[in-house]
Regions:
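Extended polysaccharide-engagement surfaces of secreted carbohydrate-active enzymes
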Residues: 1-191
Length: 191
């Protein structure tokens, strides 16, 4: 908490923001009930800043139990309702609960074994999950997410990028480029 920061009414705040540490983009058309708003996430579970902290404090242990394996996920709200969203939390965080991809049924990190899908996963590798070419304006957003490192090597993802674009008033485009090390079934979730 920083008491020197003065409150600003939401109507006077920026309608979009790129949270670079966590690689999250948020955009809204306005503050009305029928506004269009969305978020897109593609970063390491504790943010990029955690990489240096893990190295600086060797006795510190990450616990990402509240983070989800949702790199590349997005939520869209328009005209007073969700157009897309996550399916909800079912006790064990799973990639399939989010708007992203699984490969032969395998999702991101080391999901499915408990509450912390990132336990034992190399944070240096997770730190490579990132947004690129983020462009935001009053009329839209375009970005590319490199999601390759969200998946363990055993999953067989050689490269996975997702292009996400929005052009006001309501055109969304999502384009995935995937290169696999072996033939497998790709499942795309849209909730």
């Amino acid at each position: 908490y920083n008491p020197s920061i003065k409150p600003v009414p939401i109507e006077q705040q920026s309608k979009w923001h790129y949270f670079a540490d966590h690689e999250v983009v948020f955009w809204r058309s306005d503050c009305n009930d029928n506004a269009t708003a969305f978020s897109f996430k593609a970063g390491p579970p504790e943010g990029h800043g955690a990489t240096a902290k893990v190295k600086a404090f060797p006795d510190w242990r990450l616990s990402s139990g509240h983070a989800h394996p949702d790199a590349g996920g997005f939520i869209i709200w328009a005209n007073g309702k969700y157009l897309t969203g996550d399916s909800g939390y079912a006790g064990v965080p799973m990639t399939e609960h989010h708007n992203t991809l699984v490969f032969d049924g395998l999702g991101q990190a080391d999901e499915g074994k408990g509450h912390d899908a990132f336990a034992g996963v190399s944070y240096d590798r997770l730190n490579k999950i990132k947004l690129q070419n983020v462009k935001m304006s009053e009329t839209g957003v375009s970005l590319v997410a490199d999601l390759t490192s969200a998946y363990e090597a055993k999953v067989g993802v050689d490269k996975f990028t997702r292009r996400f674009a929005f052009t006001a008033p309501g055109n969304f485009e999502i384009e995935d480029t995937v290169k696999l090390k072996r033939e497998q079934t790709i499942t795309s979730f849209l909730h």
